[in-house]
């Protein structure tokens, strides 16, 4: 079963232009869905992504990528 990443293209703390390529580096075969995730509160202050239906957030994109690497299915 492939990994799935879901990210918002409207939240202030998430930079889609840099985050998407980094997620693809982590897992090139993952399904990626871009759109509102109804996670607006945390999305204003922290970078976030849903990984396999689990929300992950961190103060910086680098920290978020570290968390994503730990949560993906190998």
From Swiss-Prot:
InterPro entries: DUF1450, UPF0741
Family label: Belongs to the UPF0741 family.
Protein name (Swiss-Prot/TrEMBL): UPF0741 protein YwzC
Organism: Bacillus subtilis (strain 168)
Gene name, Swiss-Prot/TrEMBL: ywzC
């Amino acid at each position: 079963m492939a990994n799935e990443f879901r990210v918002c293209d409207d939240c202030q703390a998430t930079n889609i232009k840099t985050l998407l390529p980094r997620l693809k580096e982590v897992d090139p075969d993952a399904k990626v869905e871009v759109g509102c995730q109804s996670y607006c509160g945390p999305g204003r202050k922290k970078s976030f992504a849903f990984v396999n239906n689990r929300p992950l957030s961190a103060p910086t994109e680098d920290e978020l990528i570290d968390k994503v690497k730990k949560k993906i299915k190998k």
